[in-house]
Every structure is written in structure tokens, then in C-alpha cells.
Design a protein with these regions (language model features):
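Short, glycine/proline-biased beta-turn/loop segments that scaffold the active-site neighborhood
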Residues: 17-32, 173
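Short, surface-exposed loop or secondary-structure junction motifs
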Residues: 35-204, 208, 212
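General secondary-structure edge motif
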Residues: 2, 22-23, 130-134
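Active-site SXXK
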Residues: 1-18, 42, 147-155
Length: 212
């Protein structure tokens, strides 16, 4: 909902038109099969983009574990439940050039407590989207990737990161002081309501420590 608010504001400010190609704002897509996707295709979820991409896999050190990362059954090597039918191991670590346990130059994106992502990872995200399989355009299929690209477009056109834009233009004016994209920056953890019982993310926070 936050991204859509920002998209509507940018549209009102004439920062784009619905018929603009998303590659007009993300030039890395110009030499791909996504080059002609229109902004309206993304908004309507009719772009043909894949529903989701597990970007985090690019940050995992594949030499830090043996065997498969996932299993369809819980066992000694895969003790953590990932979803209804998938279990994941918890003995892997992240690539130290991509994930840090503290904020430092080049590692400014906080993704969890004591877990920072390298700024260059945005290029990895764009590359993964660029190389992903494109389905049938014009047919409804929900995709998180649509709104990732819309976020990138809005941030570029409005010249602000999404969290600051939404706080300054919407949340603060509404007095919605407990609404934020990065709640760890403004709220105590006891004031943040969990959105899901995600043991995998908890494991990620724990095992990021070897990358210090």
C-alpha cells in the first residue's frame, strides 16, 4: 500500500505517464525482453513478470554448507521450517562481501537487526529481474517484482528513498507515527507487531554473525 501511495503522488506530480516504459527509468532493462513493459502493465499485474525471485540466494555462501539448502522433509540437516512443505538448513553463512553484522561504508542497507546488505546488491536485484523468465503480457498474474520496479522508478523520479518519501508526505501528516517501512529506526522492538511466524528469518539474523 505504501508503494502505491508514492506512485500516485509521483503521477500527480507528472513524474511519469502510465504509458511510459519502465525501462525509461531503469535503463538496465533496455537490452532485455522487459524493455517494452509499460508502467500500467506493472500496476495492473499484467506484465508477465515472475511472481517472485529469491534474491537472498545470491548472498549465501554456497561453500559454507554441503548438500541441498532445502528439503521437503524435516531432518537433522534441515531443521528450520521455511513454508508448509519446505525445510531449510541453518548451518550456512553469508558472503562477507555482501552481508555485514554492522553498518560501515558500503553496507548501509539494514535488513534486520545487526544485518546490513552491501549497496551493490541493488545491481544484483536488477540483474536477476532482467534475466528472469517473462510470461504472457496482458494476462493478470500477481507479481511482487512489479512493485519492486515501481519503487525504483518512484525513488529515482522523486529523488528520495521510499521510507523518507512516505514519512514526509503521508505518515507524519496523518499522525501515523507508528507506521513506517523501517520501524527499527524509530520504534522499540516491543512496539513492532510481527507479521508472520518466520523462523527462517530469525535464523538469518542469528547466522549472519560469522560474517563479521
Amino acid at each position: 500500500a505504501g508503494t502505491l501511495l508514492a506512485v500516485m503522488k509521483a503521477y500527480d506530480d507528472k513524474k511519469f505517464t502510465l504509458n511510459n516504459k519502465i525501462s525509461d527509468f531503469i535503463p538496465e532493462l533496455k537490452d532485455s525482453d522487459k524493455k517494452n513493459l509499460a508502467v500500467k502493465d506493472l500496476l495492473y499485474h499484467q506484465s508477465g513478470l515472475t511472481p517472485t525471485i529469491n534474491f537472498y540466494l545470491n548472498a549465501i555462501d554456497k561453500d559454507s554448507y554441503k548438500g541441498s539448502l532445502y528439503s521437503n522433509a524435516k531432518n537433522q540437516a534441515h531443521p528450520v521450517r521455511f513454508d508448509a512443505r519446505t525445510y531449510v538448513r541453518n548451518d550456512f553463512s553469508f558472503l562477507p562481501n555482501l552481508v555485514s553484522a554492522r553498518k560501515k561504508p558500503g553496507f548501509t542497507t539494514e535488513i534486520a537487526r545487526n544485518m546490513y546488505l552491501h549497496d551493490s546488491f541493488k545491481d544484483t536485484i536488477i540483474r536477476e529481474i532482467k534475466d528472469s523468465r517473462l510470461g504472457v503480457r496482458g494476462k493478470y498474474k500477481y507479481s511482487c517484482i512489479n512493485f519492486i520496479l515501481l519503487k525504483m522508478m518512484v525513488e529515482k523520479q522523486m529523488r528520495q528513498p521510499m521510507d523518507r518519501l512516505l514519512h514526509g508526505m503521508f505518515f507524519s501528516k496523518l499522525g501515523a507515527w507508528h507506521t513506517a517501512y523501517n520501524p527499527l529506526h524509530i520504534l522499540d522492538t516491543m512496539q513492532i507487531v510481527p507479521t508472520e511466524n518466520d523462523h527462517f528469518i530469525l535464523s538469518l539474523i542469528h547466522i549472519s554473525e560469522p560474517t563479521r
